[in-house]
Structures are given as C-alpha cells and as structure tokens.
C-alpha cells in the first residue's frame, strides 16, 4: 500500500484517505498546507507518478489516477461500472447488509468519491472521456470482466 512505502501508520491516515480538503479547518501559507487530506493526496499523487516514471507495473483504484497519469505512455485508464442491481447484490454479500442499507452505503461512498475526484481533478468523476475503456461488469460478471480486461491490456501493451 501507499502508506507502507513511506512507513506511515495506516491507522493514523486512513481517516484522511480519498477525502477532499476541509476548507474551513485548513489553511495554505506560502504553498504549505496544514490540511492532512491535501497533504496525503499530494503524497499519494507524487508516489504514483514516481512509480510510473520508474516503469513499475501496478494497478490503482481511484485516487484521481485518470488525471495523475494523463499523457503517460503505457498507461491504461479503465472505468468499471455495473448496473444498480448487480452493485446492490455485491455490497449486500460483501458487507452482509440488507438492500436499503447497501444502497445508502453506495450513495454515501459515491458522493465522497465524486467530491474527492472533482476537488483534485479538472475532469468530472465518471466522465468516460477521461478513460481509455469503460466497461459494465454486470454484463460479463466479474470473472468475465477480468478476463476481458486482461486480454485488452495484453494487446495494448503488445502494440
């Protein structure tokens, strides 16, 4: 994980991860911010850019990666979506909750993801033009989607 690369305790920073800066409680003076959300995001962005520049092969989920890697060669930007029924069933199974709670949980997480992405990026969260490929995982199921994306990436990298 990003935290372990920099020897940072995950328990301390987890509450600031993928959250937009709280403007009321933070200040920026001479380019330095006291916002843990902003500082953590910038640290993550810099680490990801450095790993890509070093030629490392890795997968990033979220974290504004569509914009972080903009213009870099050999980067495949993928947006995976699913229909509501498939997402609700998956959340219910994974988190052992009823459908109503699953929908509320998804809405809350998506709202936070959107706020984080849109705070740090020029593109809007979920804008398909920011990605190389968008796929609905409910069409092929998860295993089928993985197989499809694996083949796509292999062909992309072999070009």
Name each model feature, range by range.
Residues 2-57:
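ATP-dependent small-molecule kinase phosphotransfer cores
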Residues 18-26, 38, 67, 98-143:
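Small-molecule kinase domains that catalyze NTP-dependent phosphoryl transfer to phosphate-bearing small molecules
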Residues 41, 45, 142-150:
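Short, amphipathic alpha-helical "lid/cap" segments that border enzyme active or binding sites
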Residues 49-52, 58-95:
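ATP-dependent NMP and nucleoside kinases share a basic, alpha-helical "lid"
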Residues 95-98, 158:
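Arginine/glycine-rich "motif VI" loop of SF2 helicases in the C-terminal RecA-like domain
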Residues 155:
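Glycine-rich phosphate-binding loops of nucleotide-dependent enzymes
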